[in-house]
């Protein structure tokens, strides 16, 4: 599809003609439908706490990036945290992946960089977590009394990870 669109544009076909092309229009309609569905899911699954938007997408088989979340929440958040994946899953399982968290600065609001180094959150419990200060991630970790333990992650662990991250965020 992308090659078809690119070749049409290279041959001088107008954008309007490309968008109404019988090969493109149905795919574009489907993409718009999926986008509207994701907008609804994000809206229904997101809570803003202390200017941190928390989107709970775990167990839904859906993934979204934080830019989508921060675009929807707008100026009410300085950053977002997206929880996604499947509780109890591990790497290598077909159609399932470990429950994880992604962190993003609201770059629509903070164009020169965020107010907080989000890698601090991503590396708090996960030694493999990290990324960029304004966009990073980690796996949710199994915790007992705030310490990482070697066992399958539960729903309670998601809550424990979130609670610790919210404490850290509050100290920014």
Model regions and ranges:
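Glycine-rich, acidic loop segments that terminate in or are immediately followed by a histidine
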Residues: 53-172
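Glycine-rich, Lys/Arg-enriched anion-binding loops that position phosphate/diphosphate groups
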Residues: 1-76
């Amino acid at each position: 599809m992308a090659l078809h669109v690119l070749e049409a544009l290279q041959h001088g076909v107008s954008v309007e003609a490309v968008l109404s092309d019988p090969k493109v229009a149905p795919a574009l309609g489907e993409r718009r439908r999926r986008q509207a569905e994701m907008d609804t899911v994000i809206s229904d699954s997101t809570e803003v706490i202390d200017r941190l938007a928390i989107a709970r997408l775990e167990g839904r088989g859906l993934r979204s990036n934080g830019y989508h979340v921060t675009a929807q929440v707008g100026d009410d958040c300085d950053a977002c945290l997206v929880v996604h994946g499947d509780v109890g899953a591990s790497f290598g399982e077909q159609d399932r992946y470990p429950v994880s968290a992604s962190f993003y600065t609201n770059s629509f609001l903070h164009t020169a960089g965020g107010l907080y180094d989000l890698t601090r959150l991503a590396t708090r419990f996960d030694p493999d977590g990290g990324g960029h200060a304004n966009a990073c991630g980690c796996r949710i970790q199994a915790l007992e009394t705030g310490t990482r333990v070697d066992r399958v992650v539960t729903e309670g662990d998601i809550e424990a990870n979130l609670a610790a991250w919210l404490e850290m965020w509050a100290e920014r």
